[in-house]
Amino acid sequence: LKNYDPADEMLGGFTSRDGTIEFYNRINALLQPGFKVLDLGAGRGAWYYAKIPEYKRILRNLKGKVAEYIGADVDTAVLGNPTTDRNVLIKDGVLPLGDGEVDIVVCDWVLEHVVDVASFKREVDRVLKPGGFFCARTPHSFSYVSLAARVIKNSSHVKFLRWVQPNRGAQDAFPTAYRCNTLSAVSRRFGGWKSYTYLYTAEPSYYFGSKPVFHFMNLIHRLLPRAMTGSLYIFLRKP
């Protein structure tokens, strides 16, 4: 059975180990009406065009829940992102935002693509208010997803992702680097920040749209160490 989705069998359209529900539940708990939130690496807003249940769409949508929701990316596609109040283009690694302008920085499946982590961290630190939150979701460096991405050349990455994730668009696949994708790397890069980071294993995402393969991968998730199946759910508070 191709294009199988285990969430279709669950009331509400999501499983008990839905990583997006887990991540955005926690972000929503931090929101305040007067906040400014930056979606760093927002891209074209791919989730907006995806077929997802209404509950997940409401949870994922931060626009209207805060004073301003800003999208930023190095890709000009962000300028047409319909999910935000305002979009800005990152040029030469610099965010066109003021110092201490935002209360929360959200980085969803972006950190694994960052090559110059030091510059990235400096910009996050600059635009984030003291006491603000940096919230990121990224694969662990030792997960089978990360290991496979290292083996497969970036030029073949798009074809591979379309094979194992049939519902993923080619325009939403990008080269990977994995420079800040372990708990120790996060602690080292963000020294002095209060960390609420944890390792979370969601249901398998890479199963070729096949029900038997999904259940096999689910078994693998139970047997392998968490670092090989999980992702980092990074929640840091700036001092």
Which functions belong to the PLM regions below?
Residues L1-L30:
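Class I SAM-dependent methyltransferase Rossmann-like catalytic core
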Residues L30-S146, Y233-K238:
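Conserved SAM-binding loop
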